[in-house]
Amino acid sequence: MPRLLIAASGTGGHLFPALAVADRMPETWSVRWLGVPDRLERQLVPSRYPLFTVRAGGLQGRGLRKLKQLIQLLWSAWPVTRLIRKQECAVVFTTGGYIAAPAILAARLCRRPVVLHESNAIPGQVTRLFGRFCSRVALGLPQAADYLSGCRPEVTGTPVREDFLKPAACPDWVPAGDGPLLLVIGGSQGAVGLNRMVRAAAPALLAMGCRIVHLSGHVDPDQGQLEHPAYSERPFSEEIPALLQHADLAISRAGAGSLSELAVCGTPAVLVPFPQAADDHQSANAAAAAAVGAAVIVAQHGPNEPGLRRMLWNLLGPRLRGCDPAADPLRLLRQGMERLAVRDADRLLSQLLQDLAAEA
């Protein structure tokens, strides 16, 4: 039975696409997982796949500090090399992040094919440094290829959890009514500024008959300040796939995972990129979506500025006023999301890994 080693660690953006690929591998394959101690994979992976861990850090800072971190990453490749040989792994797949560098180097030392998946429009530092050592660099967005030299890029899209691909009923706690449903996804980082923009714009929309579901995140000092029968606020929901499928419009950050989930659900979006994202990659992700007519972009601004309020009125106003559906801007955005969506990214990556293992 051939074995796949998956190296993915840290955040949902790295783990969920990797889990989708693991679940898509044929039953004739066995999966092993490489992670870092005390990270999210300790909660998500062991019940499904054998988990092995090594210590690996990032590449922050400059000069001697960065050189020291690079040496530590290289040193981490040795235990991964032993793991690949002991487990007899035929191919290695990684979704980037800290764990990717030792996994890529170990695969090369063991002469195993390795695929690195880059989900963002601007590749991360590890992808830019180590992508040239990979058999393929799989891309979630084609714009990333412009930043990679000496690599073998292949556009596959970014896999999403199966829940996003299955029709689901609208949760019963969503405010009832005939008005358009606006879904706000604050995200796990930098949500306070976005939440304040939304709360400033919400009263006028609610007065016109709009319904709002606001997932404000777990760090929100203003939570509970806005009350209205058509406004439902929660820190988080496990039912995001169903919410996206039933929302008429979403307001979201522009992380690659969120963008892929919006796309496969066909949900029109106002994207507010997180201003402190590394290399401003969320702005590049948002631009990629806007380029195919899938979303509009609003830069984060103070709650008293009119940018988001005006955009929401432009998008929701025609529906709230009962205008001709043919002139509804949300219809055009939904068509754009259909163009952006790659619903079989997990299958494409699974097949790529099998093909490379067969050629090795």
UniProtKB/Swiss-Prot annotation:
It is an enzyme of class 2 (transferase). Gene3D superfamilies: Glycogen Phosphorylase B. Its EC number is 2.4.1.227. Pathway: Cell wall biogenesis; peptidoglycan biosynthesis. It is a peripheral membrane protein. GO terms for molecular function: UDP-N-acetyl-D-glucosamine:N-acetylmuramoyl-L-alanyl-D-glutamyl-meso-2,6-diaminopimelyl-D-alanyl-D-alanine-diphosphoundecaprenol 4-beta-N-acetylglucosaminlytransferase activity; undecaprenyldiphospho-muramoylpentapeptide beta-N-acetylglucosaminyltransferase activity. Pfam families: Glyco_tran_28_C, Glyco_transf_28. CDD domains: GT28_MurG. It is found in: Cell inner membrane. UDP-N-acetyl-alpha-D-glucosamine binds at T11, G12, G13, N120, R161, S188, Q282. GO terms for cellular component: plasma membrane. InterPro entries: GlcNAc_MurG (IPR006009), Glyco_trans_28_C (IPR007235), GlycoTrans_28_N (IPR004276). Its main location: membrane. Keywords: Cell cycle, Cell division, Cell inner membrane, Cell membrane, Cell shape, Cell wall biogenesis/degradation, Glycosyltransferase, Membrane, Peptidoglycan synthesis, Transferase. GO terms for biological process: carbohydrate metabolic process; cell division; cell wall organization; lipid glycosylation; peptidoglycan biosynthetic process; regulation of cell shape. It catalyses: di-trans,octa-cis-undecaprenyl diphospho-N-acetyl-alpha-D-muramoyl-L-alanyl-D-glutamyl-meso-2,6-diaminopimeloyl-D-alanyl-D-alanine + UDP-N-acetyl-alpha-D-glucosamine = di-trans,octa-cis-undecaprenyl diphospho-[N-acetyl-alpha-D-glucosaminyl-(1->4)]-N-acetyl-alpha-D-muramoyl-L-alanyl-D-glutamyl-meso-2,6-diaminopimeloyl-D-alanyl-D-alanine + UDP + H(+). PANTHER family: GLYCOSYLTRANSFERASE, UDP-N-ACETYLGLUCOSAMINE--N-ACETYLMURAMYL-(PENTAPEPTIDE) PYROPHOSPHORYL-UNDECAPRENOL N-ACETYLGLUCOSAMINE TRANSFERASE 1. Cell wall formation. Catalyzes the transfer of a GlcNAc subunit on undecaprenyl-pyrophosphoryl-MurNAc-pentapeptide (lipid intermediate I) to form undecaprenyl-pyrophosphoryl-MurNAc-(pentapeptide)GlcNAc (lipid intermediate II). Belongs to the glycosyltransferase 28 family. MurG subfamily. This is UDP-N-acetylglucosamine--N-acetylmuramyl-(pentapeptide) pyrophosphoryl-undecaprenol N-acetylglucosamine transferase. It comes from Synechococcus sp. (strain RCC307). The gene is murG.
